[in-house]
Amino acid sequence: RFKGKNITFESITVEWLRQYERFLLDENKTASTIGIHFRTIRAIMNEAKRAGKIKETQYPFGRGKYQIQAGEGRKMALTLDQIGQIARYDDGTSATAKYRDYWLFLYLCNGINVADFVKLRYRDIKDGEIYFIRQKTEHTLRKQKDIRVIITDPMQRIVDTWGNPKRPDSFIFPILNGKETALEQKHKTQYLTRAINKRMKSIAKNLGIDHISTYTARHTFATVLKRSGASIAYISEALGHQDLKTTENYLASFEREEREKNAEILTKF
């Protein structure tokens, strides 16, 4: 869907790769998935170079050209100050306010995925907490645990502003009606993800923030907790991860921040 099916070797330039990376980020692809895509392209371009299909000057990878990000190279998480800027952002349009609030709800609701967000129902709320199981893991063989999220005042305000009337079987937000096929549900989820990302991209540009997407909300939730001193085990459970390694990958940018801060301490003499 990025540039069609027929792509020539000559069209794969540094700029093309950067545009493709941005496209994948907007599609909510993880850093590891993006790395897989680009290593595959690089392998194809390496073979094309060996076969004489492209010249060395046309090869888009390497120092001074496009470099594939390592797993911890991209800073995905925002700071609390940036989140505050987003929460206060207002361009006067209802659409921006709605999608901004949806993004904030994703962040506040343990970095919930859009696929799980659209399926939340009022019956999932018990004693001031939302209970849900991640769609990504609900069909695995491992025993499933509910993710529980305290409903904070900002979350409640978002529900009151944009939610459906409160009935036990009703979806909290007016995205699904419960009559969709699995494919229709997938398409509605994808449409909502793109709509949120489009608005958040505009907000990011206006606020001078590098990149904001639904995926950023999840990374930010994890990193803010880590910065506050929460244990990796707690963060892993809050995210619904099956193992700590996955959580550690999420927190890679935080570890980089810590190394930079500690390195700076060493120079204070």
What residues fall within each predicted segment?
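Active-site/catalytic core of tyrosine-dependent DNA strand-transfer enzymes
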Residues: 83, 152-209
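Catalytic-site neighborhood detector that most strongly recognizes the C-terminal catalytic loop/helix
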Residues: 77, 134-139, 239-264
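DNA breakage-rejoining catalytic core of tyrosine-based enzymes
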Residues: 10-11, 55-56, 68-88, 141-152, ...
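Short, basic (Lys/Arg/His-rich) helix/loop patches that form interaction surfaces
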Residues: 88, 93, 194-237
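Basic, Lys/Arg- and aromatic-enriched nucleic-acid-binding interface segment
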Residues: 35, 56-114, 118
